[in-house]
Amino acid sequence: MAVAGGPAGKGRDISLAALRRHDPYISRIVDVASQVALYTFGHRANEWEKTDVEGTLFVYSRSASPKHGFTIMNRLSMENRTEPITKDLDFLLQDPFLLYRNARLSIYGIWFYDKEECQRIAELMKNLTQYEQLKAHHGTGAGASPVSLGSGEGKEADILRMLTKAKDEYTKCKTCSEPKQISSSSAIHDNPNLIKPIPVKPSGSRQQRGPRPGQTSDPEPQHLSLTALFGKQDKAPCQEATGPPQTLPLQQQQPEKFPMRQGVVRSLSYEEPRRPSPPVDKQLCPAIQKLMVRSMDLQPLAELPESRPCTDALRAACAGPAQTGSPRSHALAAPGTQKLLQVQSIPGAENRCEPGAPAPASSATTPVSLAQPTRLSSALPPQTPGPRALPRPAPPGPGPGHQPVTGPGEVSPRELLRRLQAVQQEQQLPAPGRPALAAKFPTATLSTRARNPLEPWRDPPPSTEQPAPLLQVLSPQRIPAAATPPPLMSPLVFAQPSWAPPQERSRAPLPPGNQDPAATPTGLLLPLRTPEPPGTPGSALSKLQLQEALLHLIQNDDNFLNIIYEAYLFSLTQAAVKKTL
């Protein structure tokens, strides 16, 4: 066997001494490459990756088995790359790279700075590999360990020889089993004969595996060569080298798992259509059903009380405050929407509606003191500061400027949906309860209090309290049904408002409903008596209350916004006139 020459003399002796510090069985240096770098083929990324190994490559012979090997003395770190040359190695030359695959089925590439050294080392590696294969085949048979080649060197204990023998025995034991029984990753990497195509691989794959040059005399089936992997390109898919031992067992298990997955999909697809939807709309009144399906408006069903078991009580809550001609009346329809929601949330509330019950509102000409106290359902739970909190319907009582001027159907669907969303958001806020006692309504009316749920419940000064009919707070069980509601009176007729001089009317404390007296349509109010000056003046609004009042009026009262805008334009013109002067 001809071995190419390399550096000789004293330099080689120094290198041999350095190599023997790592492996004392090295006998001599066969060849040397001055500058190389090691690359590894990434299995998952399907590309070459540079390692931290870079330096001089030494090909040497050993006095123990394996007889030959090569080492890259790393210049970057203390970790060198050592690979024994055995019959399981496979080399392929692609200038300036020398590709090889070891017994663990790992693919590496050695980059050479000098192309002549690359060709020389590649020829040497192939010759040494063929020599090891011939020795293993003619010495003890195919697949046997080349331990017998070193038997003439004495009976000294060699740990590397013992490890090689144990590995070969383990390899022979594993080749007798079926590939699908090998499931551990260590067995796949440690078994060089695992990718033989005998049990499962089709016969056409044998034609794809061409034998390496010089191996025609070996009757044993060989691994996939690097020529088939990297014959025409530097980067080939790693699945061709490591695919058969991993994909073949999965192909056998796939027909078993596939029907089970299909069964799961079928069961899910059959069960989904049979999921029953919650029957919410079946137990609701027609008015609530129309509200849930986003109807254009709430149409009255009939004019006779006998044909309206439940609808008029609900319509008195939503259509009464909402059917006005001013923009403010649209903002005051939220208590009615709140009442509709609360009847839906309380089970059996639609069954408690009594047809033929008296109307919940009084006439414009009949005093309330001559009749029974007006029965109103309050949306205030125990100790709740606002009537639009949780969980009872809102009072259907009217406020100033809420006489039924126009017919039903004035509320637009967009306005109705907006109020519904606002009521649902307020119902989710936790609020302390308020005992269901008789509530006295001083200056603030029911409609104004319903527009601000966060307003604190304030009593008027003692001097302003006069005997007035009490609006009793009832549960939803006592919601009565009524005929067509008569014209409604303003509650200001029955409650003495706080007195303020006419010239200071704008400075007087606003009601908790945040209504602006200047923005209120005067055509819809009844004439009121001029109150006498009380003994103590009313308390002023806080900053938070004033802010909420202004925001509410700007968002819901177009007349108030127009007044502010006109004042703003007037101030601009006045400022411009002053600047010109």
From Swiss-Prot:
What domain of life does the native source organism fall in? Answer: Eukaryota
* Complexes and interactors: Interacts with DCP1A.
Q: Quote the subcellular location field of this record.
A: Cytoplasm; Nucleus
Q: Where in the sequence does UniProt note compositional bias of the Low complexity kind?
A: 244-255, 355-367
Q: Name one GO biological process term.
A: deadenylation-independent decapping of nuclear-transcribed mRNA
Q: Which residues cross the membrane?
A: none
Q: Which reaction does it catalyse?
A: a 5'-end (N(7)-methyl 5'-triphosphoguanosine)-ribonucleoside in mRNA + H2O = N(7)-methyl-GDP + a 5'-end phospho-ribonucleoside in mRNA + 2 H(+)
Q: What's the source species' lineage?
A: Eukaryota, Metazoa, Chordata, Craniata, Vertebrata
| Protein name in UniProt | mRNA-decapping enzyme 1B
Q: Where is the composition biased (Polar residues)?
A: 204-219, 368-381
Please give the organism: Bos taurus (Bovine)
- The gene name reads DCP1B
Family statement: Belongs to the DCP1 family.
Q: What SUPFAM superfamilies has UniProt attached to this entry?
A: PH domain-like
Offer a single GO CC term for the protein. nucleus
Q: Which residues carry this modification: Phosphoserine?
A: 145, 269, 326, 412, 475
Q: For the region Disordered, what residue ranges are annotated?
A: 181-222, 236-258, 349-411, 427-468, 498-522
Q: Name the UniProt key words of this record, in alphabetical order.
A: Cytoplasm, Hydrolase, Nonsense-mediated mRNA decay, Nucleus, Phosphoprotein
Q: Where is the composition biased (Pro residues)?
A: 382-401
